[in-house]
Amino acid sequence: MQEKAKQYEYLIFDADHTVIDFDADERRAFRAAFAAAGMDASADMVEACWAFSAQNWAQLGLNDVHLPELRARYHELYHTHVREIIHYMDTMYALGTRKGAAEAAFSDTLAMAAHPVAGAAETLTALAQKYRLCIATNGLAAMQAGRLSELAHLFSHVFVSETMGVIKPDAAFFERMLEALDTSSDRCLMIGDSLSSDI
């Protein structure tokens, strides 16, 4: 006898690299930072900054979400990451007195409505006809709210680690999420791009 397929009530989506395109958004933020410093950024300049960002993210341990010491300092290190990006840009391209303006432009632009991953909006719209959709993401609350603004109407809840007081994949994140939803784990399906950081 064929086993009956599990019926989910909630589909819980990670945000970056699942629903929204962080890489495209970060490149846009680099261009805005250079513009705020009075520079016309070449593609090579943007790519160099993007490569540094990825390297610095790893060096700060922000990929190591299973380590207790990282979990305790994740949001602090996120701010450090942004400062080190701007320091790199200043070192390489001499932002000078416009360094502060560049940093503000970078952060403000990264908090703008994000580029959706190809096909995401259409897929989410279709799924919202049958399921309740939620977001579960690590990041800064104000930034993620801005980035998700054009898709927000599709989600019943948006859970951001800074507001939750704990990051994924800590069990406490999911326990608090389930409590807020007043549901159980067997009624939810988590959808993301990383087995190590999303579940």
Protein language model features and the residues they cover:
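Conserved Lys-Pro-Asp/Glu-containing loop-to-beta segment of HAD-superfamily phosphomonoesterases
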Residues: 167-199
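Core-facing hydrophobic residues within beta-strands of well-ordered domains
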Residues: 8, 154-155, 185
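Substrate-recognition element of Asp-dependent hydrolases with the DxDx(T/V) motif
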Residues: 98-115, 120-150, 158-161
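Catalytic P-loop NTPase motifs of RecA-like helicase/translocase cores
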Residues: 19-21, 143, 197-198
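Receiver (REC) domain switch/active-site residues of two-component response regulators
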Residues: 16, 156-157
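Short hydrophobic segments within beta-strands
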Residues: 14-15, 136, 191
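N-terminal helical cap/lid subdomain that shapes the substrate entry/recognition surface
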Residues: 5-118
